Amino acid sequence: MRRFNWVLRHVQARRTFDSAIGLRQGSQKPLFERYIHATGINNSSARNYYDVLGVSPKATREEIKKSFHELAKKFHPDTNRNNPSAKRKFQEIREAYETLGNSERREEYDKLQYRNSDYVNNDGGDSERFRRAYQSNFSDTFHKIFSEIFENNQIKPDIRVELSLSLSEAAEGCTKRLSFDAYVFCDSCDGLGHPSDAAMSICPTCRGVGRVTIPPFTASCQTCKGTGHIIKEYCMSCRGSGIVEGTKTAELVIPGGVESEATITIVGAGNVSSRTSQPGNLYIKLKVANDSTFTRDGSDIYVDANISFTQAILGGKVVVPTLSGKIQLDIPKGTQPDQLLVLRGKGLPKQGFFVDHGDQYVRFRVNFPTEVNERQRAILEEFAKEEINNELSDSAEGSWLYQKLSTG
């Protein structure tokens, strides 16, 4: 029997300890925790939580959340400075939502309400014990609820942006100054979340120790998060988070030869989350625009050169653009349409190769006239006859009869 009583005492102590330090399965802490003091739970909160939020006991979680947001904005002390009762009303609304907005707590609360309706002589002690059981968690979740009102969602530390480059910028390399939206430390409070001269008071839960002990267990106090004190004020600019939306700038040195979709990383240039953690990174995805003159294929480029059909036959000269300027090329005699001429090393820089540049390919586009004058026509007809004679001669020279006749 002694052994049983000893086990029972320790089980009860463990349950009491868990309630005191706020251990709840599935609980998640908000990204920015500022341990803002909230007045203790008022006895007026004995009202039914569903009535406080103006919803039905069968209301969905979304309906409860929507009603809470509307009421919280309406009765928030910041917008009701001349209405002392608004603070009590806001606290009542917050307490109701902290219970009904959590599925586990709501289930326990509903069971309690059912019991109270069954036993007429219930003295209300169950309701008060329910509040005390969760009171240590109310301060812990206050910032999360406060953030929901003002839509201060969790911040992802890394930032991803895109930067457009022209082909010439990608080929030669350049320096770019980039501005982008980011979360930065609040200037008003220097990222503290509260005024630098904000008054502090001893934590009522741990009485300044920072730890809660219920033999044989000891753990960090969940009300003050181990600091031993709580702050009664919060920064109005950042609403206690220490973080605000702002703009950052970064200078980016882009090497020559970068390709589209390449990503450049700047460590520590992303969003800030707290003064005790490192900022996220900035990831810049490059987008190289298509060029009206050149077509790119890796480190090689292609350009078209328009020539006449007489230049294609007789040869000649043509001026073509390159990345470093225009140059004059010799057109080989007998150039065929779409024939390529290679200019070695005239392409884009290569990264990490022994050959430091790609090539430029000149594609000859042969233009044929749609109209000719009489003289040109006569010349072309004569040329055509000559072609036919040459073809017949070539054909005859290759025949068995021609070979016999020529050898006599």
Curated annotation (Swiss-Prot):
Task: Please name every pair of cysteines joined by a disulfide bond in this record.
Answer: none
One example of a Gene Ontology biological process annotation: response to heat
UniProt keywords (A-Z) are: Chaperone, Metal-binding, Mitochondrion, Repeat, Transit peptide, Zinc, Zinc-finger
Q: Would I find Iron among this entry's keywords?
A: no
Q: Does the keyword Metal-binding apply?
A: yes
Coiled-coil ranges (or none) = none
The segments carrying the CXXCXGXG motif repeats are 186-193, 203-210, 221-228, 235-242
Main localisation, per the record? mitochondrion
Superkingdom of the organism of origin: Eukaryota
SMART domains membership: DnaJ
- Tissue expression, per UniProt? Ubiquitous.
Q: Which InterPro entries match?
A: DnaJ, DnaJ_C, DnaJ_domain, DnaJ_domain_CS, HSP40/DnaJ_pept-bd, HSP_DnaJ_Cys-rich_dom, HSP_DnaJ_Cys-rich_dom_sf, J_dom_sf
- Every J domain range: 48-113
Q: CR-type zinc finger positions in the chain?
A: 173-247
Task: Check the record and name the Gene3D superfamilies matching this protein.
Answer: DnaJ domain (1.10.287.110), Heat shock protein DnaJ, cysteine-rich domain (2.10.230.10), Urease metallochaperone UreE, N-terminal domain (2.60.260.20)
Outline the subunit composition: Homodimer.
Family matches, as HAMAP family:
DnaJ
Protein name as catalogued: Chaperone protein dnaJ 1, mitochondrial
Species name: Arabidopsis thaliana (Mouse-ear cress)
Gene this protein is translated from: ATJ1
